[in-house]
């Protein structure tokens, strides 16, 4: 069984930053990631980061990703891609599926930096082709150069929904409406203003009634909701669209931690079920730490700091 001083699961901003920091102090470090490319969400993000200079403000996400990869390579970090960690055990052992093979590794310490997954809202027709998450839209646009659709309705007015709406329009898509069940916009005013100036109508206190179509999305009906988020009869509005894009938050990908018996807690402010950990990311499992969105939903800059 191969042994490393430090095993990191996830080559996103948190995992790579942790690997760079650790490798600079001498330990042997390996990072496993299930994707073909490292960098996590960073390479989907073409917008500039906010914050201070030490948080890489005014630098585009994909540029930050390239910087982290260069720093990791220079530090001697071993990054193994197309490697899915399918098991985590209390004796600091991980089981990794690489190709058709299963391999076991042990570490003196393990950092789980698996990030988060997109939430979805269910409604009649939500499983039709053409209903996608905002992260999927970013992947199609910014990684593969593919338009997710021509006429798009965006559900969610947080920063992700606003930024992705603007990126879709920059690429030639028509965003027919931006819808949110909340009574006010959830994202930064600067992002909302950019979308509004493009003529996109905002429907606040509204949500989706149903997606329409047989084999794929052909249209969508929305309606106003009351303070208890119940549909108000007679307020329905129809849009002809081929894509419904959802930006309704993220949930930590904590499955490995649960598998190993890590103590968890429900914390809606941090995205749902998260591991109980201290300020250093120490979990209830000896030698197992967490960093990034798996410990609570934050920005990529926060993940790198952790």
Positions of the model-derived regions?
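Residues forming the flavin
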Residues: 1-306
């Amino acid at each position: 069984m191969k042994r490393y001083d430090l095993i990191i699961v996830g080559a996103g901003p948190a995992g790579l930053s942790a690997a760079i920091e650790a490798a600079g102090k001498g330990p042997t470090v390996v990072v496993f990631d299930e994707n073909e490319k490292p960098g996590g969400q960073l390479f989907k993000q073409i917008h500039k980061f906010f914050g201070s200079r030490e948080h890489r403000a005014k630098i585009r996400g994909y540029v930050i990703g390239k910087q982290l990869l260069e720093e990791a390579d220079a530090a001697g970090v071993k990054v193994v891609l197309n490697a899915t960690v399918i098991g985590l055990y209390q004796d600091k052992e991980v089981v990794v599926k690489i190709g058709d093979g299963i391999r076991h590794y042990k570490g003196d310490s393990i950092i789980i930096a698996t990030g988060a997954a997109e939430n979805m809202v269910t409604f009649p027709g939500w499983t039709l082709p053409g209903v996608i998450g905002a992260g999927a839209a970013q992947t199609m646009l910014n990684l593969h150069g593919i338009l997710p659709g021509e006429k798009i309705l965006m559900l969610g007015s947080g920063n992700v929904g606003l930024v992705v709406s603007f990126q879709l329009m920059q690429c030639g898509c028509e965003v027919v409406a931006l819808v949110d069940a909340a009574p006010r916009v959830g994202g930064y005013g600067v992002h909302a203003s950019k979308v509004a100036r493009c003529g996109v109508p905002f429907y606040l206190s509204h949500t989706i009634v149903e997606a329409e179509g047989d084999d794929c999305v052909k249209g969508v009906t929305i309606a106003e909701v009351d303070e208890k988020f119940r549909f108000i009869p007679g307020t329905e509005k129809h849009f002809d669209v081929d894509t419904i894009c959802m930006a309704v938050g993220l949930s930590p990908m904590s499955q490995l931690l649960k598998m190993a018996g890590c103590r968890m807690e429900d914390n809606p402010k941090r995205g749902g079920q998260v591991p109980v950990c201290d300020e250093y990311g120490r979990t209830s499992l000896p030698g197992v730490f967490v960093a990034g969105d798996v410990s609570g939903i934050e920005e990529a800059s926060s993940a790198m700091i952790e």
